[in-house]
Amino acid sequence: CIFFIVALAYYFADYIKKFCKEIYIVTSVISLMSIIHTIYLLNGYSISYLVGLKQFMRAIDSGAMGGAFFILVMYMGVFDMKYKVSKRLRMNRGELSIIACIFTIPHNTHYFFAFLLNSKNIVKMSGIPLWTNLMMFSAGVFAIGIMLPLFVTSFRLIRKKMTGKKWKSLQEFAYIFYAMVFVQV
């Protein structure tokens, strides 16, 4: 998934910058479809898929798609800017971060409701299984709490209303977010 995302980000860098709003809309529609897909799955519906669609939905639902975008965004911070590939990838760091957040929301939604629907079984657990479930849920909720302000302030319209210093200090919370994602993985 990560190699595919890097290739897309590199080869379509100019288009991502130029058509970012349209890409956000398409990404949001796909994410909404994934959330609806999750609702059907959690309610026990059997779904017939077109070839490749099941894997695509699974990539979004599992968090792999959003995670791949976040990995790229995270590593862009250490790219050496003297290389053309680094400059080309980094020119859309904010846009790719927004896309990552949009693709992560279905994953968050699925596992939040799966946890709630499965809470009767989780309370019966003890030891490591209970601790693991509670830790994963807590880390996820904490990560979402950090991700949402970062997501909102990544939009140029919002970012322009903030001072550079305030925006940069808020963006430092991204490192905590990455740590929470690491805990979950």
Question: Where are the model-predicted features located?
Answer:
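Membrane-embedded alpha-helical bundles that constitute the cytochrome b-like, heme-associated redox core
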Residues: 1-185
